[in-house]
């Protein structure tokens, strides 16, 4: 007889099936609701120039190959309003039609005033008219490359185009193929921490808004007094966030989809150099400024291209906050980045997306992969494929229960946590059979021992039950306090049917005597712990 466990949500969530996508929070955890139920974005972002119909045939097979359920793709201001006041949504309609045909959800990336801080995706009539749409001024009074967030003319033009975009979605996407929107992209300014124009300087010398000093617990004063060496950057963060918040409010008034902004990061723990960072963007140390300045934005999110495991963990820690749902809208598509999917799940992430996932022939190494060969693609396809079969159920469980995840650290050491009565440890670089402490049975090192692969994620379903997924990992479940009566009662491989866990087979003997070992075939397991009396 099949062993079953039911995962359910409280009625107030389950009853919202006719509502559009939205993000909800409970007990410090978050869920993206799509069609009324939690949804985990197993996403992939295409290259920057794949936002044309001619490129789409090189996109869908790649998404299918890695079992992605969501595409992140740009729609550029220059693309929909090449002539001021004349809008063309041909590509957007093509995208909607093809996404539906390929059973993919869509996250639209609005490349407008800022794309990686640049105005490159603005229409020609914007980028060539510096009087009407002014750039920032440097300390020396010269034009900088980035548009200033102080210009009402630029804001109104961007907002008008964005509202037209959202209006088109309202009229042509009632089924919510598009589930989320990213207004702008990696905002801010490099090598110039703020606008130094006369108008901006006057604002800089005024008192910091009281709402911000109150939130930060700082005394009143002007920007220099309150923020010291980071004053220019704090100022630019505030006004950039206010600019985008107004765009988001206008767009949501038409169609209230969840909206997030993404951050070009500047190191996981250092205080950034205002002239070296994308000043104005939502880096982790200015998140509180963004939260006060832009309450309409649902999340600030990290774009992660740092390969170091310690740094990735710090970024995930910083952005997974009770007031900020975690999603990773961009991460490198090199093979070693795939392991961080598990750590993101362990932080309760609502989405994860390697960048540059299409077959157009462009690779952004050294940020990402040198090539999308089979081993690279399989590193993402394996975890995505395992979770895809339980995607809704995992998302529900992660919203209702504690989670933990670990990626193989760069030093190959163990990772562990305690959930309730049980200690969970992830070990790496071992064969599936036997113990590394054995001296009587010789073995060669596991081929993957030196490779940056492997990880696991768990959800604690009840006091003694866990849902887990992983690859290239040995998982050990033990009592948090030594207890000779404690044991693994059962390890089940299975699936969900209508929200109920159905056991396909029980792992026992060699499959559990040396920990729970998963190598190159990620699977979802239910682990039941207990004690005999």
Question: What kind of region is each of these model predictions?
Answer:
Residues 36, 71, 99, 165, ...:
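Conserved, mostly hydrophobic/aromatic
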Residues 431, 435-458, 463-533:
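C-terminal beta-sandwich/jelly-roll accessory domains of carbohydrate-active enzymes
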Residues 56-132, 240-256:
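Aromatic-lined substrate-binding rim segments of carbohydrate-active enzymes
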Residues 131-287:
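Polysaccharide-binding and catalytic clefts of secreted carbohydrate-active enzymes
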Residues 104, 246-257, 285-393:
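Catalytic-core region of carbohydrate-active enzymes that cleave or remodel glycosidic bonds
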Residues 16-69:
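N-terminal carbohydrate-binding accessory modules
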Residues 49-65, 275-293, 311-312, 338-341:
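Short, acidic/polar
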Residues 342-477:
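Aromatic- and carboxylate-lined catalytic core of secreted/periplasmic carbohydrate-active enzymes
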